[in-house]
């Protein structure tokens, strides 16, 4: 199954729908571009944490309930959805996080976890930015 990040734009075709992988890759690339210009304001560890947050911030969208909301071809029994921010935040354990960023400590993991979770809350609380 191919997972998507957002629904098809109004009047758009299914070919315009962005896959979840492409969205996450684009987000990482955007952060890397930002760091090319402004990276001197951040430590290497801070940059690594931000890149990792970008890499996983929407992984919680890879669930059948969310996908059925943005893909009407999927037929799922109506059920309460766990917000994708909760799921995204839980995709990376402290151990896996420290494998990606060996110099990270527990406080860094807490900041990362909070950032991933809150990135999703921004989407939930701003309905004009939601596309599903």
Feature locations, PLM:
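Acidic/His-rich, divalent-metal-binding segments that scaffold phosphate/diphosphate chemistry
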Residues: 1-78
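Histidine-centered divalent metal-coordination motifs
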Residues: 23, 57, 84, 122-123
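An active-site-proximal "capping" alpha-helix that borders the catalytic cofactor pocket
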Residues: 26-32, 83-97
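Acidic/histidine metal-binding catalytic segments
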Residues: 38-52, 98-122
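Generic short alpha-helical segment signal, independent of protein family or function
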Residues: 55, 64, 90-100
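Short coil/turn segments at secondary-structure boundaries
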Residues: 75-83, 107
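Single conserved hydrophobic/aromatic residue that forms the stacking wall/gate
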Residues: 123-132
